[in-house]
């Protein structure tokens, strides 16, 4: 499966909620879903057909997958990893996804979207525990320190993104804006993750 190349705003409209895929635009009135909160396409307003149980499960899987910017193979691999862990599979899946470096960068506020975070990581702007990491899928562990590389501390993209961030937006993260450093305190509990999705539907879908 290739990367999605059409307008990502259409994905939000299809799910009828913000997936925060477009960076700063998602936080303004320019976000298309503010004025067109219906499915894209010629018949977007008139789509009222009954959705099957499978359709509901598939829609939820697609939504979570798109939120985190993953391909189907990647997403399925994370699910298989979640199954092998102790606890509730759906919650394990979300916890794994929250540990991805691109997601942590986004949550810390160093990037306006996970997509932008991936670009910044690939361009070698971040360090984890003083080691340069250029792999967006790198899984951050409890106690890891994520910081902007010294030569990258003047990047406008990072500073513009930080303007929308509070000092302690998430209980499992801390951020020092002065040094552009963040700490991953612990793997978050599912209840703390601001994700409007039902991961149990994904478990049901993949269990068929």
Task: State what each model feature region is.
Residues 24, 116-119:
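Glutamine-centric residue-chemistry signal
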Residues 111-114:
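Beta-rich strand-turn-strand
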Residues 1-108, 135-208:
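Ferredoxin-like alpha/beta domains used as RNA- or RNAP-binding modules
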Residues 120-121, 140:
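Short, well-ordered loop/turn sites that connect or cap secondary structure elements
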Residues 124-134:
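Glycine- and Gly-Pro-enriched alpha-helical subdomains that act as flexible
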